[in-house]
Amino acid sequence: MNGTYYTITEVFDFGPHISKIILDYGKSMKGAAPSPEQFTVHVTRTSTEGENFVWPNFMGDKPNDSMDGTRRVSNVYVSDKTGAPCEDGTCLTLELPCFIMEGIGSIIKFNGNFNVFVNVAYDVTQTSEIATDDDAISPQTFDVDGGNRVIYGEW
């Protein structure tokens, strides 16, 4: 059985993007020192309307990676289930960079008329063993969506 992940969406001035993925290992990750290179993150975004988006002519050529592609991991740390750093947490939190020109991390998409929400599915693979104080965590895949939490700007 594959693992469960949770996402955190931050609302930036250029729109809402998934900035963190929390991987639930279900056991203590104390002593783990994971690196971004130990993970690959693939995302597939699909229309909630059930059909492909019309790409308007005024926007130029349609990018190939607008709905399916990979995300870069910039940082990884041991955390609790909310994504807060925690020395004896049971999760690892992956931080993902978010940029205005990289729409693959967004939870919205321009449909030709308006920005609309899209379905987002991640497939996160731990590619190498991670040592902890208790044992070693073998490579595994996380593709079961456990839910999303939105963080709005603080005023």
Task: Enumerate the predicted regions with their spans.
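Non-catalytic beta-sheet/beta-sandwich ligand-binding modules that flank or precede catalytic cores
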Residues: 1-155
